[in-house]
């Protein structure tokens, strides 16, 4: 009965466990069975706490049974139900205090407790802890503690329960220690899939729209990537072949329970790994290249000899589980993962990462020996152009760039780095993308004015109609040019979406309104004239939509841009020559003295006249978000695109999709002269060429280019931005010389003498 005489009379802990005199048949375990005696031999003293809840009533909803100090199993360090003397039980019966236990209990057999004993039967009920709430150097139950996890004095504080982070560590460590047999994980998978056969009429798991997790997005007939895991566990390996690291498609790699003393730096080549197990080896350090494995979700390093961890682990922003149990790690590292978990430790390593040595400067590649000194301002017929996506502050978030330290992402830090880089290159023409209005008007225009730059800027279309403060955050395109070298003749902006809907053939074309019009990407066009030579130049600064799922939109945006540029070029041909081309000069030097060797200013040449739009030199710079070989690339390079191109996906865009796309300019990528760079955008999830400097090859010639980034530096850096590169894009720079116009050959007139001789 719940309301009997002994309603609240519960026995002491001693009556739930065997007393010393009751175990004469186990004398070897007497030291484990000594109990702190209770004040009542019978254990039937009534509790004075009248608020104690009835054991027959469920605890309140806001109270966990494990937090009730009067329940039988109140140990805070064990999360498993019905644990007696550290062992899991198959029988779940409540011991009754009114009945004496028999002398022998076969199902409560006592087992010796060792600090590092491994349970091979019940991993889910592992009870030997090497850290946290229990010491790994003492017995589980000391004379000061009862076996149910509470102290002998009910007034003493109960130990703080072990948190979920360390519980997970211990459980995973126990599972790892069990997996010591050769090819344990491969055999486990084979056992699970035993008897399962795939028939030809089975449905493709991807056909229902569910994407396969951790599967390379390759063509289905790529048989090699049908297997993405390797298990070398329990082989006694002492070294790894370099050939292993050529399998860059690997998703899981098991190297556990071997005798590896070191891990090759080539491990950084396996960038697709999501699971890496190097537990139970003899490792004393982890190579810095481990930071290149940014797709890792689980990294297990149990039972090695690691005393520290490389700061490059901070790059692993997707890591959910880092197993470090069984290593003599420094307290600052171990305590953080014990108390706050893997994410906290990774963030700590990322933020505390020291600044590495900067890479060597990118080479300036001379393609034409006559232009060797022109980068510093030599021949007036030559000029340099730079394009740079600066990564707008609004887009540089910790969620998007989780591998970058907060200090390296801070806009104040990055904008100074950007400014110094632009000033260092000192290009005649600078095209910047992703510059917000606030940064352009409040920083770059003012700062670059000290370097003789004048600027033209337009924000993206969504800035129209916004409040002023909100509009400042909208990014756009800015084009700067040296004021002492060029005169601005005209400037224009192309809003691709608005231009598309104004076309006469846009009626009834739903894709124009549903896909293209909603994107507010733009291009800024400036028409310049060289003060000294009179040569004119069209500079297009474009930023094309980014999403790979909108290849059709990218193609149509570029087609509209080139169509508009063609119309503008035809208008620019008719602009009359400049009459006043003299640059502003101070009447006297700043020191008040005539500078020595000052030469007479060169008389500006008259403006060059052009008979057609295609004769005007043109540069098309920017971030096109399209790789070499794409439809966008081919349209610019070849001047024409067929109407049935697969990137259009049979969508309707008026005459552009019915009749095809074309432009009259003979454009060529500046870097195609030597082969495109390895990349212009560098992040863990995407590394490829998407930025270009296109030039009209009939009027311009490339004479020099800015080269690649230091390859050795990139072996330990998984992505930009960082402390040396302020954007996820690279700056591209090229030097050009204007080709002289070809005049028609003059035929000699010999008069009537010629006719006589014939």
UniProtKB/Swiss-Prot annotation:
Mg(2+) binds at residue 434. LRR repeats lie at residues 224-247, 248-270, 271-294, 296-319. Its EC number is 3.1.13.4. Acts as a catalytic component of the CCR4-NOT core complex, which in the nucleus seems to be a general transcription factor, and in the cytoplasm the major mRNA deadenylase involved in mRNA turnover. Ccr4 has 3'-5' RNase activity with a strong preference for polyadenylated substrates and also low exonuclease activity towards single-stranded DNA. It comes from Coccidioides immitis (strain RS) (Valley fever fungus). This is CCR4-Not complex 3'-5'-exoribonuclease subunit Ccr4. It is found in: Cytoplasm; Nucleus. Residues 36-78, 165-179, 196-208 have a biased composition (Polar residues).
